[in-house]
């Protein structure tokens, strides 16, 4: 009996692993965190277009209406766009990723809105020029489209050192403030959408797929080949910076982990906070990609959500969703209702760090707020795609 019992336990463990492997990321979340709703910011990243060759059409134009249907077959789909003075019909039949699409708008030539779309198996280029917008989309099988962002450090990494130019050029600078500023009626200039280099289009991979993708400096050249990224390019430098941050030493008192899937993020957070009394929250803004604007703290006032340990996960710049997660003690989490000057509303989440003595003295927060490490609590709003976990 003493021999059989460990064998039964071992078989049981294999069964649990096998069952977990068959779960979708969303189902895995609900199994691991039965009492914790998934935030919209994470739910929106559960779109598995990453390895699809299905047609995706985005049309931005004055008065435009877009209707897209994508059937289950690879490369299939129909898109109908009705805009000001124009009708566009796209059919995605043919070879995977192929097809020719013609759009006709009002007037003649490019000024009236003419777009030609050509696609080859695995690749696609869309160019649309019309009244109210110009769109250029290129697609390569296996990764989202890099739209351009200057490679730079994650300002939420504690050992990060900022350059003087970032005080004026980095929109993340506006996210930092002092805890004493969390009062009703306080005005702040903020922009909540974080730039990830891919126009916010990167999504989670299921863990089984994410684990097949090399992630680390030792196999970086292999990673670039996997995503068809040219070594030395701006995109490659951006990816390299993310990996360097994930591999960098942690500061005193910090526990950190880079999650390459939703499932691995859940596992890390559960290991630090437990599974039954945990919440995960993100900033929610009424309008996506809202510009920098002046907000004031609404009359409803600030609400303290947690005053203990928390796990904060920051979305990184990478071809698929990667989150830099770190557990920190002596942090306070707040819900901050904001009203913009143009009527825009936001349900912001703020994290205040009471002990910053181990942070890099040249961190962006200290330069913006003109304070020294370890002197006062330093706070920051979370961009829309970031999430904080805490016990209650």
From Swiss-Prot:
<feature type="repeat" description="TXV 2">
    <location>
        <begin position="78"/>
        <end position="80"/>
    </location>
</feature>
<keyword id="KW-0346">Stress response</keyword>
<feature type="compositionally biased region" description="Gly residues">
    <location>
        <begin position="94"/>
        <end position="114"/>
    </location>
</feature>
<feature type="repeat" description="TXV 1">
    <location>
        <begin position="56"/>
        <end position="58"/>
    </location>
</feature>
<dbReference type="GO" id="GO:0005794">
    <property type="term" value="C:Golgi apparatus"/>
</dbReference>
<keyword id="KW-0732">Signal</keyword>
<feature type="region of interest" description="Disordered">
    <location>
        <begin position="61"/>
        <end position="136"/>
    </location>
</feature>
<feature type="domain" description="BURP">
    <location>
        <begin position="176"/>
        <end position="392"/>
    </location>
</feature>
<feature type="repeat" description="TXV 4">
    <location>
        <begin position="125"/>
        <end position="127"/>
    </location>
</feature>
<dbReference type="GO" id="GO:0005802">
    <property type="term" value="C:trans-Golgi network"/>
</dbReference>
<dbReference type="InterPro" id="IPR004873">
    <property type="entry name" value="BURP_dom"/>
</dbReference>
<keyword id="KW-0677">Repeat</keyword>
<dbReference type="GO" id="GO:0009651">
    <property type="term" value="P:response to salt stress"/>
</dbReference>
<dbReference type="InterPro" id="IPR044816">
    <property type="entry name" value="BURP"/>
</dbReference>
<feature type="repeat" description="TXV 3">
    <location>
        <begin position="100"/>
        <end position="102"/>
    </location>
</feature>
<comment type="function">
    <text>Acts to suppress chlorophyll degradation under moisture stress.</text>
</comment>
<feature type="signal peptide">
    <location>
        <begin position="1"/>
        <end position="22"/>
    </location>
</feature>
<dbReference type="Pfam" id="PF03181">
    <property type="entry name" value="BURP"/>
</dbReference>
<feature type="region of interest" description="5 X approximate repeats">
    <location>
        <begin position="57"/>
        <end position="164"/>
    </location>
</feature>
<dbReference type="GO" id="GO:0005768">
    <property type="term" value="C:endosome"/>
</dbReference>
<protein>
    <recommendedName>
        <fullName>BURP domain protein RD22</fullName>
    </recommendedName>
</protein>
<dbReference type="GO" id="GO:0003729">
    <property type="term" value="F:mRNA binding"/>
</dbReference>
């Amino acid at each position: 009996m003493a021999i059989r019992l460990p064998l039964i336990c071992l078989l049981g463990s294999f069964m649990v692993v096998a069952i977990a492997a068959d779960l979708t990321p969303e189902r895995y979340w609900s199994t691991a965190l039965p009492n914790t709703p998934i935030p919209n910011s994470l739910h929106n990243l559960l779109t598995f277009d990453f390895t699809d060759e299905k047609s995706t059409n985005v049309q931005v134009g004055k008065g435009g209406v877009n209707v897209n249907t994508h059937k289950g077959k690879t490369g299939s789909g129909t898109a109908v766009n009705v805009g000001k003075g124009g009708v566009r019909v796209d059919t995605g039949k043919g070879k995977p990723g192929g097809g020719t699409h013609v759009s006709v708008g009002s007037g003649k030539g490019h000024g009236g809105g003419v777009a030609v779309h050509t696609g080859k198996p695995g690749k696609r280029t869309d160019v649309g020029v019309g009244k109210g917008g110009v769109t250029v989309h290129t697609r390569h099988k296996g990764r989202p489209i890099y739209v351009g962002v200057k490679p730079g450090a994650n300002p939420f990494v504690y050992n990060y050192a900022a350059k003087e130019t970032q005080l004026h050029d980095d929109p993340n600078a506006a996210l930092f403030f002092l805890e004493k500023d969390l009062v009703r009626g306080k005005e702040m200039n903020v922009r909540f959408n974080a730039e990830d280099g891919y126009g916010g289009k990167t999504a989670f991979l299921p863990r089984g797929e994410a684990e097949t993708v090399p992630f680390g400096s030792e196999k970086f050249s292999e990673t670039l080949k996997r995503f068809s990224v040219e070594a030395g390019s701006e995109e490659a430098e951006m990816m390299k910076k993310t990996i360097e941050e994930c591999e960098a030493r942690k500061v005193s008192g910090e526990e950190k982990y880079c999650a390459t899937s939703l499932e691995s993020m859940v596992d890390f957070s559960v290991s630090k906070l437990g599974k039954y009394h945990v919440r995960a929250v993100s900033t929610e803004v009424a309008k996506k990609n809202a510009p920098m604007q002046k907000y004031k703290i609404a009359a409803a006032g600030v609400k303290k959500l947690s005053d203990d340990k928390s796990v904060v996960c920051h979305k990184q710049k990478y071809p698929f969703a990667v989150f830099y997660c770190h557990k920190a003690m002596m942090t306070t989490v707040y819900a901050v209702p904001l009203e913009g000057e143009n009527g825009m509303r936001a349900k912001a989440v703020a994290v205040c760090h009471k002990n910053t003595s181990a942070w890099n003295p040249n961190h962006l927060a200290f330069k913006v707020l003109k304070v020294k490490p370890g002197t006062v609590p330093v706070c920051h709003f979370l961009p829309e795609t970031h999430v904080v976990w805490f016990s209650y």
